[in-house]
Amino acid sequence: MTCVSYAAEGWGVGEVWHDGSRLVWHELPRPVADPSIGTRARARGRTRVTPSQGGVNHPPPSRSTITAKRSRVRAEAVPEVESLVGRLQEYFSGARVEFADAQIDAEGWTEFQRDVLAAMRRIGYGEVVSYSELAHLAGYPRAQRAVGTFCARNRFPLVVPCHRVVSSDGLGSYGSLGLDYKRRLLALEGVTL
């Protein structure tokens, strides 16, 4: 398992967790609390993620664990990671970038989850749909709450663009990053709500 940190100017430092063939986790850039790291952090990191019985659910629980287990690795060591990190950095610099071709780890997912995933990945750059519309697109017209739950648990933000799914009367939610972050992502794509 490879963990690569990447810097996104004006956004912070994010992380990509990759198993060599597919994305396992993506942590959106957040401001860096440690001033010694700075906003120009270099891609680095190799670590191990311990799978749960149901598969890999998330990286280790604490950043100190992640940092302690890292050895220095450049993104170029894994071409798929280098490409994905480059596209993420382009996206955060304002370029129109799509991620529909990025392979993700959906092992153990239900048919419903796979259908919602496929429908969400078809939402284009600069487009938004409501939770209800996404439920219809996925073939589950009465499952808007379940779709909202799927969005809330999305471990592949941007690659699976949950930020493009909004409530019928506003932005909806965006987990621990909050509505300002979601609004900022949408504004980057030319969407104002």
What is each PLM-predicted segment?
Residues 156-167:
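Local cysteine-cluster metal-coordination motifs and their immediate loop/turn environment
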Residues 1-141, 192-193:
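Basic nucleic-acid-binding alpha-helical/helix-turn surface characteristic of O6-alkylguanine DNA
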Residues 115-119, 146, 184:
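Pre-recognition alpha-helix immediately N-terminal to the DNA-recognition helix
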Residues 169-193:
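…primarily DNA-binding HTH/wHTH and HhH modules…
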Residues 120, 134, 162-163, 185:
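Residue-level signal for inorganic ion chemistry
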Residues 142-157:
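Regulatory, non-catalytic segments
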